[in-house]
């Protein structure tokens, strides 16, 4: 199955947290296996690293700004988030940005609440405004994927598995 086979050529994808561990892996795969244009919205915090993305661009012999554009933006700033969404004009948004250390979320929950809850809310508001301005044809294909964590399900039970029907049982501000 071809990656993004239901999307038009040169699909514009906005990925939040694209310089993080999982976001970086998603961007590398998209750059290698599609012709999409990636807008990497990241605040470039302590866990951000562009090295692997830059290596892929070099190996593909692609100019950095042609297929990958870094938008240094913190989602807790609504006006910057709205500007980034307007600028990228995405066909697809993948929301992977999050503060992600469970222990740190317990020690200082305020930062996690601001970043993970307010940041997500700001992105959703900006995406809604963007969606309302899309043509009928683009609305049919537009998607927003919010990627979460298995931490929302709490501690593994005796069977050691979660599935789509597992109940939420968060145990920390991170989850």
Model-identified regions with their sequence ranges:
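N-terminal Rossmann-like NAD(P)+-binding domain of SDR-like oxidoreductases, especially those catalyzing
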Residues: 1-175
């Amino acid at each position: 199955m071809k990656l993004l086979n239901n999307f038009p050529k040169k699909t514009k994808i906005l990925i939040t947290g694209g310089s993080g561990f999982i976001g970086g892996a998603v961007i590398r795969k998209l750059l290698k296996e599609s012709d999409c244009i990636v807008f990497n919205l990241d605040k470039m915090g302590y866990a951000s690293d562009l090295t692997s993305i830059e290596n892929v661009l070099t190996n593909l012999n692609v100019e950095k700004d042609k297929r990958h554009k870094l938008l240094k933006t913190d989602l807790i700033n609504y006006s910057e988030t709205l500007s980034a969404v307007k600028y990228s004009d995405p066909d697809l948004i993948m929301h992977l940005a999050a503060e992600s250390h469970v222990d740190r979320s317990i020690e200082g929950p305020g930062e996690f609440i601001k970043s993970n809850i307010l940041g997500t809310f700001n992105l959703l508001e900006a995406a809604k405004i963007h969606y309302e301005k899309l043509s009928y044809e683009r609305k049919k294909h537009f998607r927003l994927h919010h990627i979460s964590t298995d931490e929302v399900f709490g501690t593994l039970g005796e069977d050691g598995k979660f599935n789509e029907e597992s109940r939420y049982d968060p145990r920390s501000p991170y989850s």
